[in-house]
Amino acid sequence: MICIPVIDKNINDALKSAEEALKVADIVEFRADLLESVDKQDIEKMAKYPSIITIRADWEGGEYTGDNNKRIELYKTAIENNVKFIDIELKEEKNKELVEFRNKIGSKTKIIVSYHDFEKTPSKQDLMEIVEKELKIGDIAKFATMAQNKNDLLKIFAVISIYEGKIIGIGMGEVGKLTRIIGVELGSILTFASMEGRSSAPGQVDVVKLKKIWELLK
């Protein structure tokens, strides 16, 4: 699966961007934390699209600085509307509450539990421990770490292979681009690609280039 992040500041622009992105991608990620303001009605509109809804907290590299209880309630709105995925941080103390809420109401939403390190890639053992913690909470484990060398790539590829089909593993930065290209082949459920030069993280490959590379690798 290819996922294109939607990073607009205005909800109407975000919905238009999603429609364009879905012409070339399988799914979009609405970065709701990047909106100038976000309410339940906005979440309901986003949930109608094949999407991941992410309201990334500022302490995990996002831009949401509002009340955390409101953030959790917005996630619950996404779950009530059966959005395909939500992405909640491993460090968020209320992540289990969202899983329990999903289970209680019988929502079809899958919960991605994520970890980010914008400076380095931890050891393979540490990455595996992170993934194990994430899978004890949610449906899909995600890690995005800064890749600085070939050893980092090997660690990332190894962990993706171990948890094939229930993981999103990403190496950020220029060195990490290779993980975005072949991670899906090794077992990552999706990769994030940019569109028209707009990206949400360092190292995202343009969607058109990514598809051309995949064609060459067939």
Curated annotation (Swiss-Prot):
Pathway: Metabolic intermediate biosynthesis; chorismate biosynthesis; chorismate from D-erythrose 4-phosphate and phosphoenolpyruvate: step 3/7
Enzyme class (EC, first level): lyase
Domain of life: Archaea
Family statement drawn from the similarity comment of this UniProt entry: Belongs to the type-I 3-dehydroquinase family.
Annotated positions binding 3-dehydroquinate: 29-31, 56, 180, 200, 204
Reactions catalysed: 3-dehydroquinate = 3-dehydroshikimate + H2O
Subunit structure: Homodimer.
Function per UniProt: Involved in the third step of the chorismate pathway, which leads to the biosynthesis of aromatic amino acids. Catalyzes the cis-dehydration of 3-dehydroquinate (DHQ) and introduces the first double bond of the aromatic ring to yield 3-dehydroshikimate.
Signal peptide start-end: none
Keyword Lyase: yes
UniProt key word Ribosomal protein: no
InterPro entries, alphabetized: 3-dehydroquinate_DH_AS, Aldolase_TIM, DHquinase_I, Type-I_3-dehydroquinase
GO biological process terms, semicolon-separated: 3,4-dihydroxybenzoate biosynthetic process; amino acid biosynthetic process; aromatic amino acid family biosynthetic process; chorismate biosynthetic process
Protein name: 3-dehydroquinate dehydratase
EC number: 4.2.1.10
Active site: residue positions: 116 (proton donor/acceptor), 142 (schiff-base intermediate with substrate)
